[in-house]
Design a protein with these regions (language model features):
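Structured alpha/beta or helical-core interaction and ligand-binding surfaces enriched in interleaved
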Residues: 2-126
Length: 126
């Protein structure tokens, strides 16, 4: 195999991998659009969303300033996503660090082919 052929094949592999990554992002973005339309119709609070770059993945982050509101937002979204997915989260975690911050994490492994992770950090107020 010549260097030119090797470079061409490498470029084709990179192009195919990039196209697959973008396809996964598009799948995540499409699901996010559907979820946001439902959220608006159901009166859910606005939260921050990130679309993953390596997999079909969405990360929702509850960031309300008041910690009790942040927890309420998390619970509202947890219930809504669970209802839409037809099941509760595949993984649920709640843990506290040494400063007293509690991290809430729910994850659905494959909701319409997309991994959804919902998080909220509840800081100790005082």
């Amino acid at each position: 195999m010549t260097d030119t052929t090797r470079r061409r094949l490498d470029a084709e592999r990179r192009t195919a991998a990039t196209a697959e990554q973008i396809s996964r992002q598009h799948r995540g973005a499409a699901l996010l659009g559907e979820m946001l339309a439902r959220a608006a119709a159901e009166g859910l609070p606005a939260i921050a969303w990130t679309i993953g770059s390596a997999d079909a993945a969405l990360a929702g982050r509850c960031e309300a300033r008041q910690m009790d509101q942040r927890r309420q937002d998390f619970n509202a979204w947890r219930l809504a996503i669970g209802t839409w997915a037809g099941q509760g989260a595949d993984a649920k975690r709640e843990y506290a660090d040494t400063s007293g911050t509690v991290r809430l994490v729910d994850q659905w492994d494959r909701f319409e082919g997309v991994i959804i992770t919902l998080t909220a950090d509840i800081w100790a107020e005082g």
